[in-house]
Amino acid sequence: MLHRNKIHESPPMAPSNGTRAMLDSRPNDNLPRGTICIEDLEIGLSRHLRKEVTDRDIELFAEVSTDRNPVHLDDDYARDTIFEGRIAHGMLTAGLISAVIGEQLPGHGTIYMGQSLKFLAPVRPGDVVLAEVTVREIDYPKRRVTLDCRCTVGNTTVLKGEALVLAPSRKFD
């Protein structure tokens, strides 16, 4: 069993190599990955990651989820929709929020209790998504943490919402 220090670091993953991500001065994500226990969380603590959504990501998500809606996969079909082109699955974008929560804040050992999301704009193949999570409320006795969640593409918010999680605690090591 791992002992959780203030932040237990895991080896970093390779950053996204999308060219648009390189144009921005912010790093792909703020490391370390691992666990921040409930005892060490503070209101306003924030983590993020940046990912270019590729055609391959969309195809793999369609395969895993079995959501093969042609608006995600068929250029000709998608051109005739209100989106005027293919878009990524909304839940693929939401999955980036899950990655921040499960890998960084609070990180490993976190249990999802609920999430509400609003999808505000489409994400297209080639878009670079910034997924951000910020601690809004902490119920220390119950180990419950409410997180504000947001995804942006450039200056456009494409997704916003909140998540309720059960954070790991050192006293259960």
Where are these regions (language model features)?
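HotDog/MaoC-like acyl-thioester-processing domains
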Residues: 2, 7, 11-29, 33-43, ...
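Mid-chain, well-packed structural core segment of small domains
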Residues: 104-127
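Short, intrinsically disordered/low-complexity patches at protein termini
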Residues: 71-73, 83-84, 111-112, 117-118, ...
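Well-ordered beta-strand positions in beta-sheet-rich domains
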Residues: 48-50, 116, 160-164
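Hot-dog-fold acyl-thioester-processing enzymes
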Residues: 2, 7, 15-110, 172-173
